[in-house]
């Protein structure tokens, strides 16, 4: 256990595919840690539960494979956690978003009706997903209470990752042109699912995987070698660049008035650094580890890491 500036770093070894998240059941005042261990070629997954001292408290077995990954991390909303269960490729591929209620241990599967779900977000009882098939990109909005589905589609470019902030859902779009791949950020009204505007981000084949927003700004990474984290003013829709000291910025997590940014190649699992960035001043401090860092979560002054040994 290693302590730096009151941040305690706890590592969890990835066995097959493991993703960590936090939840807070109603019957317990303390947060619990869930570790999803999933197999890609079998309909089999386990969720292991730990308390805040990393003592195992239980597990839940699921007959669904390929649940979540370092690319599509689960989202916790109070005592529920949402994730994409992709299923077994070419055998039992799924078109759903899964909800696990940690108070009842019941699972709900919301049928989106589109194959190859790429990314998702959840806000105010609505689930948003993206997918691309047969040259058409689709943004889907699914109401959890009524089952009503709305879709927005385009035949130019590929929709990627997305993030809900305020009254809008922001969707990454990549378009291949003669001068190369251009990344855009679409601003779409969450109620009507109509596109408000499209903002050019950069020329890069790297996609924006991770987002984070506060009341004023949207932050997103692009896994680039230019050591840049993007910041967009939510009122002005103006994008600026925050310079980092390491390549491959990925996951963005808030800590007090600063941001943790992981640095990792998500495909290879290689990357041993995390930045602590002050977005107001642009100053950052880099923490380097002896192991690779593939994913992390913060909770109550602790930084929890999952890693791959290569």
Residue ranges and their predicted role:
Residues 308-310:
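Conserved small/polar residues in nucleotide/adenosyl-binding loops
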Residues 57-65, 104-111, 147-154, 194-201, ...:
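A short beta-strand motif characteristic of beta-propeller blades
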Residues 152-230:
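Solenoidal tandem-repeat scaffolds enriched in leucines and small polar residues
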Residues 43-48, 90-98, 135-140, 178-186, ...:
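Structural motif
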Residues 1-13:
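N-terminal Sec-pathway targeting helices
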Residues 37-38, 83, 129, 171, ...:
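Residue position within the beta-strands of beta-propeller blades
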Residues 23-63:
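An edge-strand/N-cap motif at the start of beta-rich repeat modules
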Residues 67-76, 113-123, 156-166, 203-213, ...:
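Repeated scaffold domains used in trafficking and secretory/extracellular systems
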């Amino acid at each position: 256990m290693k302590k730096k500036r009151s941040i305690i770093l706890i590592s969890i070894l990835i066995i097959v595919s493991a993703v960590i998240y936090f939840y807070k059941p109603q019957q317990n005042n303390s947060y619990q840690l869930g570790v999803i261990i999933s197999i890609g070629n079998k309909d089999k997954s386990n969720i292991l539960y730990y308390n805040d001292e990393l003592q195992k408290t239980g597990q839940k077995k699921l007959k669904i494979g390929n649940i979540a990954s370092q690319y599509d991390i689960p989202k916790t909303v109070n005592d529920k956690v949402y994730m994409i269960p992709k299923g077994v490729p070419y055998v039992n591929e799924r078109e759903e978003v899964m909800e696990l209620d940690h108070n009842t241990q019941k699972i709900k599967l919301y049928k989106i009706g589109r194959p190859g779900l790429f990314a998702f977000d959840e806000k105010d009882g609505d689930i948003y997903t993206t997918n691309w098939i047969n040259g058409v990109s689709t943004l889907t909005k699914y109401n959890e209470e009524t089952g009503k589905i709305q879709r927005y589609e385009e035949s130019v470019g590929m929709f990627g990752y997305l993030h809900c902030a305020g009254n809008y859902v922001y969707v990454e779009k990549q378009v291949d042109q003669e001068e190369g791949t251009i990344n855009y950020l679409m601003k779409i009204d969450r109620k009507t699912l109509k596109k408000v505007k499209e903002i050019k981000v950069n020329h890069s084949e790297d996609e924006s995987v991770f987002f984070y927003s506060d009341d004023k700004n949207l932050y997103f990474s692009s896994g680039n070698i230019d050591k840049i984290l993007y910041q967009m003013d939510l009122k002005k829709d103006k994008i600026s660049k925050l310079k980092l000291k390491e390549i491959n910025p990925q996951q963005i997590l808030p800590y007090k008035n600063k941001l943790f940014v992981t640095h990792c190649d998500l495909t290879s699992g290689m990357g041993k650094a995390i930045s602590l960035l002050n977005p107001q001043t642009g100053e950052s401090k880099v923490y380097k580890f002896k192991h690779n860092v593939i994913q992390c979560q913060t909770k109550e002054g602790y930084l929890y890491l999952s890693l791959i040994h290569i």
